[in-house]
From Swiss-Prot:
Keywords: Cytoplasm, FAD, Flavoprotein, NAD, tRNA processing. NAD-binding protein involved in the addition of a carboxymethylaminomethyl (cmnm) group at the wobble position (U34) of certain tRNAs, forming tRNA-cmnm(5)s(2)U34. Homodimer. Heterotetramer of two MnmE and two MnmG subunits. Its main location: cytoplasm. It comes from Aeromonas salmonicida (strain A449). One of its GO terms (biological process) is tRNA wobble uridine modification. The keyword tRNA processing applies. FAD binds at residues 13-18. This is tRNA uridine 5-carboxymethylaminomethyl modification enzyme MnmG. The keyword Flavoprotein applies. It comes from the Bacteria. NAD(+) binds at residues 273-287. InterPro entries: FAD/NAD-bd_sf (IPR036188), GIDA_C_N (IPR049312), MnmG (IPR004416), MnmG-rel (IPR002218), MnmG-rel_CS (IPR020595), MnmG_C (IPR026904), MnmG_C_subdom (IPR047001), MnmG_C_subdom_sf (IPR044920).
Amino acid sequence: MQYHEQFDVIVVGGGHAGTEAATAAARMGLNTLLLTHNIDTLGHMSCNPAIGGIGKGHLVKEVDALGGIMARATDLAGIQFRTLNSSKGPAVRATRAQADRLLYKAVVRQMLENYPNLKIFQQACDDLIMDGDRVAGVVTQSGIRISGKTVVLTVGTFLNGLIHIGMENYKGGRAGDPPSIALAQRLREMPLRIDRLKTGTPPRIDARSVDLSVMQAQYGDDPRPVFSFIGDASQHPRQVPCYVTHTNERTHDVIRNNLDRSPMYAGVIEGIGPRYCPSIEDKITRFADKTAHQIFVEPEGLTTHELYPNGISTSLPFDVQVQIVRSIRGFENAHITRPGYAIEYDFFDPRDLKANMESKYIGNLFFAGQINGTTGYEEAAAQGLMAGLNAGLRAQDKDPWHPRRDQAYMGVMIDDLSTLGTREPYRMFTSRAEYRLLLREDNADLRLTAIGRELGLVDDERWGKFNIKMEQVELERQRMRSTWIHPQHPSLEAVNALVNTPLTREQNLEELLRRPEVTYDALMAIEGVGPALSDHAAADQVEIQIKYAGYIERQYDEVEKQLRNENTLLPLDMNYRDVNGLSNEVIAKLNDAKPETIGQASRISGITPAAISILLVHLKKHGLLRKTA
């Protein structure tokens, strides 16, 4: 049966990657279909009810700067907001929000159902329609054939998903949802490298059975940070605290005594789990010297009693989970509402993707999210936006676009995945970026919104607010350069009280703000110096640009040097055995990875600077020197 309409972009899967992919394509004015096995689970938070964190918050801000929905949904559903690393430099400060799980899902669904150019259809995807070596649509579980110029796969943990609780296991995409078996089998028939990964989740607990009074309360920040560049704290619902408790030696003894009943340690689970979000079994084994591990007790929402004990993800049998939970301070009488579990699933080697998220081997087919070996809502959302954007560009026969490593954490992640691949669930950290000072949360809009506008991702409302902010920043910087404090200034005494070294010569406000001990707010509070900008985001931007100007300039110089050969193209059909002077090891690695550019090649383990020089000589000699735009 043929579906009555053809689409420019078909997105398979309605999680965090799929919703961003579908809305990105729709914002570009393209006829877009979001295909999901269950409309009621659109935007569902399968794991912890939180958005952001170090590295992750940066990705959310970048998604928002390009018009994405995650930050706005979080502002409407966030029940606790904090800035992490607030005492450190601006490069590593990160926003994190606790979200009401049900409210977040409802907000996302409402956004999707009212999105221009976007249709939603409830059917599982079982097959792809092929036209030679290109995809031309999808086939649903009930045999409906839907034609599309491009297809984006954002299927999360559903491909051959296998859920483990102790020695028992059953097929599932996540708890309560069926797996995708037919599509997984179809993809295994294609020329794609495939492997298995694992992730897990803790048991959920009824708050009425917990003694929160013996735990440490953790409140949100005041004033509250806002996630979206066009958001406001007034949008936030009622705010609530989280709580902190710890495991203890009794907890650890229970786990050690039951490791033989763990599917991970009994060899039942083959997939590799996330290094930076390990199960409690892993923690006890890997950090045997630790007598306690922190547990963040997170409310699931404002209308439920369920708690999410972040830090005790487990796949041990249910009876052991009860013992573990009840050994923890405050949980002595805890009632578990849902058992914890581990899930194994198929993922595809992201080295088989171009930097625009398109398969190197199957034209018009794009991948985003956990199918690429990543973990986390934020990583999925960022990939989804890039895949949806580039699927939209492909549908219009336009050139692809992706950010470089110096432009966005998105660029860092995509380059890491497509160049180096991953053997374990990939998670974003600020430490993965070489140019952290350029890739701050606060300047994500400065870096990306103008580009997003050109690509058709940024609407008039966001563009207007962005330009107002930019004008405020520029005018304030001009004012600070042209406002001078001289030794006879009536406010000299107040200025000298602010600085470590009193003024002996005339200085403008910009010079004063460069001093480490001076803040923008304190300087503006001096009579005759202000008024301060009323927009706190614009004021922060002024302060950071002035205080860190020298460091920022140095990073731009480093970027300029690095870019000289970064974008030199390497033909995808190039046989590196034909390049004289390369070692067998280098030839094997380059033929395996098939890098798109010299920059990608240079980041492959074992590819030496000498090998890069040989490649450049070969390209020049054969008239193959080309650069990306």
